[in-house]
């Protein structure tokens, strides 16, 4: 949807943490943002090697994308997390404790969107 905002994080899991252990914590974190009315959806993606490409990208295996209807909702969600209150504090800690240091984040806005690509 044009005008939507997507907050993405690229990261790797800590040593000894498996995907099956991690995914429920990220899902719970993302679903909380939907339940309280900030976000409209999410995607959790695993990076696949593409021979000959991606050499200039930072090292990451996963990308989590939290989808907002607009930048105002994304910014409100960011402020909500900064308040460090419950339950988002515990949900964030449960998820973040399984991720290696060095995760990186960015926000995008959709300028042209095709419904079939959602």
Where do the protein language model's features map onto the residues?
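Active-site-flanking beta-strand signature of metal-NTP-handling nucleotidyl enzymes
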Residues: 4-12, 63
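Short, surface-exposed ligand-recognition loops at beta-strand->loop->(often short) alpha-helix junctions
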Residues: 13-22
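Short amphipathic alpha-helical segment that frequently serves as the phosphate-/nucleotide-binding helix
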Residues: 23-27
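A cross-kingdom feature marking solvent-exposed beta-strand/loop segments within repeated
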Residues: 48-50
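An amphipathic, aromatic/His-enriched active-site/gating alpha helix that lines ligand/cofactor pockets
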Residues: 32-40, 54-108, 113
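Short, flexible turn/loop "capping" segments at secondary-structure junctions
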Residues: 1-5, 55-58
């Amino acid at each position: 949807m044009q005008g939507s905002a997507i907050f993405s994080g690229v990261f790797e899991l800590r040593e000894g943490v498996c995907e099956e252990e991690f995914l429920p914590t990220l899902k719970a974190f993302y679903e909380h943002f939907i339940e309280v009315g900030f976000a409209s959806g999410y995607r959790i993606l695993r990076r696949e090697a593409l021979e000959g490409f991606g050499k200039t990208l930072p090292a990451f295996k996963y990308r989590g994308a939290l989808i907002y209807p607009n930048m105002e909702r994304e910014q409100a969600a960011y402020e909500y997390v900064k308040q460090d209150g419950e339950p988002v504090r515990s949900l964030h800690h449960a998820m973040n404790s399984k991720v290696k240091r060095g995760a990186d984040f960015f926000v995008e806005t959709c300028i042209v969107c095709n419904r079939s690509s959602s």
